[in-house]
Amino acid sequence: MEFSQKLYQAAKPIINDIYEDDFIQKMLLGNIQADALRHYLQADAAYLKEFTNLYALLIPKMNSMNDVKFLVEQIEFMVEGEVLAHDILAQIVGESYEEIIKTKVWPPSGDHYIKHMYFQAHSRENAIYTIAAMAPCPYIYAELAKRSQSDHKLNREKDTAKWFDFYSTEMDDIINVFESLMNKLAESMSDKELEQVKQVFLESCIHERRFFNMAMTLEQWEFGGKVND
């Protein structure tokens, strides 16, 4: 079994939990609250900006010009390619995407996720650690979306179905490249090192779950603690 497949197998329980959590279940039914979608889009805008920067940090770690070319293309996709998915949710909210993301948010779950990825990029010379931190994002979106296509709960009369349709196909290229890179880099690593990479991958899967849940709770920093009326 290739290394990437071992990672996916280990991540299955987490992805199952994400699928059963409120965000995805309400998206399937098409009854998710506008406030949750707005908070998700605002936090995701901040996340995607940093995710794009991480692609740039990966480029110097690449040995192949083809890999560099693909990463540059992915930067362009991050800037423009997910516009359709964002617009689908913005239309449900009833505001333009540009108007929604004028309000900047940086919730704890997004903060911790981004810092997890940057730590791998800055502290590890081997690109596999950064890739392992980034790879769960497209992989989990694709897995959730593909699973939705055969789920009777997917409400085709609601616009949220289009969001699932988008991610059921649009992540395949980056997933394949991340798989190829990880499998190639894993060949020269020890079992102990590969276990560390697996840990990085699974931590990002947990961060993905917390990110979706963050939208449902409208998560914010509670610097003053919770006030009990």
From Swiss-Prot:
Effect of residue 115 to A: Affects the oligomeric state since the mutant is a monomer that is much more susceptible to serine protease degradation, but has nearly no effect on kinetic parameters
EC number: 3.5.99.2
GO terms for biological process, alphabetical: thiamine biosynthetic process; thiamine diphosphate biosynthetic process
Catalytic activity: 4-amino-5-aminomethyl-2-methylpyrimidine + H2O = 4-amino-5-hydroxymethyl-2-methylpyrimidine + NH4(+); thiamine + H2O = 5-(2-hydroxyethyl)-4-methylthiazole + 4-amino-5-hydroxymethyl-2-methylpyrimidine + H(+)
Binding-site positions, substrate: 44, 141, 167
Active-site residue list: 137, 208
One Pfam family matching this protein: TENA_THI-4
CC per GO annotation: cytosol
MF terms in GO: thiaminase activity
InterPro entries hit by this protein: Haem_Oase-like_multi-hlx (IPR016084), Thiaminase-2/PQQC (IPR004305), Thiaminase_II (IPR027574), Thiamine_Salvage_TenA (IPR050967)
CDD domains (alphabetical): TenA_C_SaTenA-like (cd19360)
Subunit structure: Homotetramer.
Protein name: Aminopyrimidine aminohydrolase
Lineage of producing organism: Bacteria, Bacillati, Bacillota, Bacilli, Bacillales
